[in-house]
Regions:
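Short, Lys/Arg-rich flexible segments
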Residues: 1-195
């Protein structure tokens, strides 16, 4: 989140009068630009850090709220939401555990496309093995297999939990942009004071 706030007592802010309004106008314009610059920087960092499969996560990195008052400006950049709930765990890392079932089903190579996206869920392939070209399915040693007349194929690994390492893309983008943010906000203040 980007935040700019004029801090001081009410008497000082009142003395600034119209100058304060000019400074805040310039800061608002600068913050709006920086908000969009940060979106792009986070998307660039995401491309560098994560293997892009569907593009959903990178597409969820968007400008969030933008609130401006006489003394405060706040601009946010958001990622995730909806089906992209995993954005936070990619940024910070953590352990995923099943909620309503006993195991997580992790797709193995035969159950994924070339870009690594699951072709179907374990539930779907169990309910209708023919969607994957199988005649049946079965579990053995923590693996869901698909059966064909020619043999068996491992499709999903069953896990009680999976720990993902932190793969930050938002925080590094903000750190890389810090000099630009400081420079552009200082310039906006100077321009507002000169008006």
């Amino acid at each position: 989140m980007l935040r700019a706030e004029i801090i001081g007592d009410k008497a000082l802010i009142a003395r600034l009068g119209s100058t304060n309004a000019k400074v805040m106008k310039r800061l608002g314009l600068a913050m709006r630009k920086l908000q969009y610059d940060l979106v792009q920087a986070a998307r660039d960092e995401n491309r560098a850090v994560l293997h892009q499969r569907t593009g959903n996560l990178i597409g969820s990195i968007l400008p969030g709220t933008f609130d401006q008052s006489d003394t405060k400006i706040e601009a946010t950049v958001v990622a995730g939401g909806g089906e992209n709930f995993y954005a936070r765990i990619q940024e910070y890392g953590g352990t995923i555990v099943p909620k309503n079932v006993s195991f997580l089903t992790i797709p193995l190579d035969a159950a994924k496309t070339a870009s690594g996206v699951g072709r179907w869920s374990a539930r779907e392939i169990i309910e209708d093995p023919s969607i994957g070209g199988y005649t049946g399915t079965f579990f053995k040693h923590g693996v869901l297999f698909g059966k064909t007349p020619d043999g068996i194929t491992p499709l999903f690994a069953l896990k009680s939990s999976v720990t993902l390492p932190s793969r930050p893309y938002m925080r590094p983008a903000l750190l890389k942009m810090r000099p630009q943010i400081e420079t552009e906000l200082a310039a906006a203040i100077a321009e507002g004071l000169q008006e």
